[in-house]
């Protein structure tokens, strides 16, 4: 055997000699060269690196050289894999692995010794891909490609602490194949999307790798299923829908993204909109400094953290100092009821969606206030959830302020206690990184989630507490497995908002202070 032939690659590891920087990178090939693989790694683990991107057709392990060659079924699959792993170094057994195109076009391993284990691993993977065998730990839905399976995925984003846009979804899901179309909408107070791949296999691998993963740390969880639809009909290219094969489509501002038959097939209302469409000052995609990236461990050892690169969000952050644009953490809150609103009340309410640092009610116009959040993303989240809600008989409006910070009054300046600094408050819900509170952020609703209830406090005690606060209690339920928590349903969303302001951190005795938040559930 000699390794000079360009048609195949043999067991001498010839590609390794080409890493000296004395030649340009190889052109795309379906054969990939892996270096620095751990000496005790298994064939299945190496195959798992390629599995999310398409069918793996051959494998050659050179354990003595800590190298391997992986052959994909198509050049397109290999290109997708390289594109994914270029910014994100894969790891096997906690050790970084380096991948590049081989200068060979295919693997020829028929007559080589010690190939039995590699072939057995390939056969096992082939059985999974053909639907005859499930992956260990995977359900039939995940591990097998069923006949006629749809290339369309239905995606639900839970715990939407930061805005997730069409561009962000495209960047994440493009790692697993060619994305043809995306439609985003809101249903049941949840941000959802339909995403169509060119091939059902791509949809299969994306679901396997991404279902249950977080886009950002401890929030924005992906829930992925196959759609009953087999294709999407996109009429407009805008921030809600996109057909990447038809760049000529109109923007269709204000038009529904789905045609009625498609909406009916999905069980969705006729008019669907992004939860952020029309929000004042909201740009289609924002890069958040807190975003540590999407972790994708579904294929053992294969995928490291996926950090959203600047390509999907370039030009979307506001210029520092620009007024009324994302990047500002100060909100202007208007149309408040001056007879009832206080800085503390605004601190408690806006604190549901982020850590409030300062609040200023305007001295000469007390129906207006400034609320400074910990960062721009929290300000955006609070604005999206609270603007338009009724509070003390008036419809609250929140927009991004032209101010970059709330100034404290100078010594001797008349203020009447209208400006408060809460930056060191013990009531901040999100001061701990990765706090579970990130996972329980929901829009205002008539049902409140109560927690930190001491054992001596009864259902009647809590119902009376809310009744005395002026609420009409419609239903109450302790959690079956944990009586420290309960749900209480009030007469309206406005009642619930006002009850949260008044009763969050209420002293229940026994060194227990009531914790109140909005619930996604009903009783």
UniProtKB/Swiss-Prot annotation:
Region (Disordered): 1-25, 406-426
Gene3D superfamilies, alphabetized: 3.30.70.330
Lineage: Eukaryota, Metazoa, Chordata, Craniata, Vertebrata
Entry's Gene Ontology molecular function annotations: RNA binding
RRM domain ranges (all copies): 30-114, 153-229, 329-403, 446-521
Descriptive protein name: Polypyrimidine tract-binding protein 3
Modified residues (Phosphotyrosine): 98
InterPro entries cross-referenced by the UniProt entry: HnRNP-L/PTB, Nucleotide-bd_a/b_plait_sf, PTBP1-like_RRM2, RBD_domain_sf, ROD1_RRM1, RRM_dom
Source organism per UniProt: Mus musculus (Mouse)
UniProt KW keywords: Acetylation, Differentiation, Erythrocyte maturation, Isopeptide bond, mRNA processing, mRNA splicing, Phosphoprotein, Repeat, Repressor, RNA-binding, Ubl conjugation
Subunit structure: Interacts with THBS4 (via the acidic amphipathic C-terminus).
């Amino acid at each position: 055997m000699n390794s000079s032939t360009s048609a195949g690659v043999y067991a001498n590891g010839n590609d390794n000699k080409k890493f000296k920087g004395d030649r340009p990178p190889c052109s795309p090939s379906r054969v990939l060269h892996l270096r620095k693989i751990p000496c005790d790694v298994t064939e299945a683990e190496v195959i798992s690196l390629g599995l999310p991107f398409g069918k793996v057709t051959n494998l050659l392990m050179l354990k003595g050289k800590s190298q391997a060659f992986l052959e994909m079924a198509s050049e397109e699959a290999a290109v997708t894999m390289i594109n994914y792993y270029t910014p994100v170094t894969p790891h096997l057994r906690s050790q970084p692995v380096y991948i590049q195109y081989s200068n060979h076009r295919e693997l020829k391993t028929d007559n080589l010794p010690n190939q039995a284990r590699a072939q057995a691993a390939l056969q096992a993977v082939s059985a999974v891909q053909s639907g005859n065998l499930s992956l260990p730990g995977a359900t039939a839905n995940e591990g097998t490609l069923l006949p006629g399976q749809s290339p369309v995925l239905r995606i639900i984003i839970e715990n939407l602490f930061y805005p997730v846009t069409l561009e962000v979804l495209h960047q994440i899901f493009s790692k697993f194949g060619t994305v043809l179309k995306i439609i985003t909408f809101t249903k049941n107070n949840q941000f959802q999307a339909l995403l169509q791949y060119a091939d059902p296999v791509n949809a299969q691998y994306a679901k396997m790798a991404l279902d249950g993963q977080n886009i950002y740390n401890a929030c924005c969880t992906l829930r992925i299923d196959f759609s009953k639809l087999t294709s999407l009909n996109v009429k407009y290219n805008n921030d809600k829908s996109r057909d990447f094969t038809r760049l000529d489509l109109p923007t269709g501002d204000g038009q529904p993204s789905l045609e009625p038959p498609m909406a009916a097939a999905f069980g969705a209302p006729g008019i669907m909109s992004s939860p952020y469409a029309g929000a004042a000052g909201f740009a289609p995609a924002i890069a958040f400094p807190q975003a540590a990236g999407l972790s994708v461990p579904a294929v053992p050892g294969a995928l490291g953290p996926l950090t959203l690169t600047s390509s999907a969000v370039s030009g979307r952050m506001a210029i520092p100092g620009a007024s009324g644009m994302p990047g500002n953490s100060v909100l202007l809150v208007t149309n408040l009821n001056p007879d009832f609103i206080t800085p503390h009340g605004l601190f408690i309410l806006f604190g549901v969606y982020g850590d409030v640092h300062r609040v200023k009610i305007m001295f000469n116009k007390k129906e207006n206030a400034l609320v400074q959040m910990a960062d721009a993303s929290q300000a955006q989240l609070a604005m999206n959830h609270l603007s338009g809600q009724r509070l003390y008989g008036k419809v609250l409006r929140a927009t991004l302020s032209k101010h970059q910070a709330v100034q404290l009054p100078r010594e001797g300046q008349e203020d009447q206690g209208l400006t408060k600094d809460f930056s060191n408050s013990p009531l901040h819900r999100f001061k701990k990184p990765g706090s579970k509170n990130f996972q329980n952020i929901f829009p205002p609703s008539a049902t409140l989630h109560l927690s930190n209830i001491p054992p001596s406090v009864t259902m009647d005690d809590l119902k009376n507490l809310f009744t005395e606060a002026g609420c009409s209690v419609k239903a109450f339920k302790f959690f079956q497995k944990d009586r420290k928590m309960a749900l209480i349903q009030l007469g309206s969303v406005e009642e619930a908002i006002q009850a949260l302001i008044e009763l969050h951190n209420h002293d229940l005795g026994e060194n227990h202070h009531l914790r109140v938040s909005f619930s996604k559930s009903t009783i």
